[in-house]
UniProtKB/Swiss-Prot annotation:
Subunit composition and interactions: Part of the 50S ribosomal subunit; part of the 5S rRNA/L5/L18/L25 subcomplex. Contacts the 5S rRNA. Binds to the 5S rRNA independently of L5 and L18.
GO molecular function: 5S rRNA binding; structural constituent of ribosome
Gene that this sequence comes from: rplY
Lineage, broadest ranks: Bacteria, Pseudomonadati, Pseudomonadota, Alphaproteobacteria, Rickettsiales
Name of the protein described by the UniProt record: Large ribosomal subunit protein bL25
Biological processes per GO annotation: translation
Family under the similarity heading: Belongs to the bacterial ribosomal protein bL25 family. CTC subfamily.
Organism: Wolbachia sp. subsp. Drosophila simulans (strain wRi)
Free-text function comment from the UniProt entry: This is one of the proteins that binds to the 5S RNA in the ribosome where it forms part of the central protuberance.
Annotated SUPFAM superfamilies: Ribosomal protein L25-like
Length: 203
């Protein structure tokens, strides 16, 4: 499991906060944002819509450590919320959270299901029933994995994989307690075609 690369985003300090001014900001090709966090004052930001949208559409912002270049000052952050236009689906506002590189953070990491070809249950026609596609973990910012792999090797129809079965990279641990050993994926039998009995007709 490889660690994620840090994504860099440029931003400027923003003084305006009124709705009309924010609308004007968007018309000029910018996106309003904010960064907040424990022990920090809230800071209003302006982002380039073109630059941010490119990163957003590439999927590089999900569960990634962000290096924010705020008017020349670097801050580390996570994207916590992206508000989209209800009709146009364009980015309207972005929330960031300050990250202290020396402390652990909570973050959702996508699960990657590997070795389907080595699962007898799937070879026999079983269906992979995914119940959980991401999981909350704790780690230091420099240990954030790109994905957490779930190994399907050897799994038969009717078998499941639970969260405690998943191996985590060094320095990464689950947020959930050990007693919450919930199921993340099962291999189920495919629905078989059943012929309906023909109704008898009287002559």
């Amino acid at each position: 499991m490889t660690q994620q690369e840090i994504v860099t985003i440029n931003a400027e300090l923003r003084d305006i906060t009124k709705t009309k001014a924010m609308h004007s900001l968007r018309k000029k090709g910018n996106i309003p944002g904010i960064i907040y966090g424990k022990g920090h004052d809230n800071v209003n930001l302006t982002l380039s819509a073109k630059e941010f949208t490119k990163q957003y559409k590439s999927g590089s912002l999900s569960a990634h450590l962000i290096e924010l270049n705020i008017s020349g000052k670097k801050e580390y952050a996570l994207v916590r919320d992206i508000q989209l236009h209800v009709v146009k689906d364009t980015v309207q506002h972005v929330d960031f959270q300050f990250v202290d590189k020396g402390s652990e953070i909570k973050i959702d990491i996508p699960l990657s299901f590997v070795n389907e070809s080595k699962a007898p249950g799937i070879k026999l026609g079983g269906v992979l029933n995914v119940l959980c596609r991401s999981i909350a973990v704790k780690c230091s910012p420099d240990k954030i994995p790109q994905v957490i792999e779930v190994d399907l090797s050897g799994k038969m129809i009717g078998q499941s994989i639970h969260i405690n079965d998943v191996k985590l990279p060094e320095g990464v641990k689950f947020v959930a307690h050990e007693e919450e050993n919930f199921t993340i994926v099962t291999i189920s039998a495919a629905d078989s075609d059943v012929e309906e009995p023909q109704a008898e007709t009287e002559e």
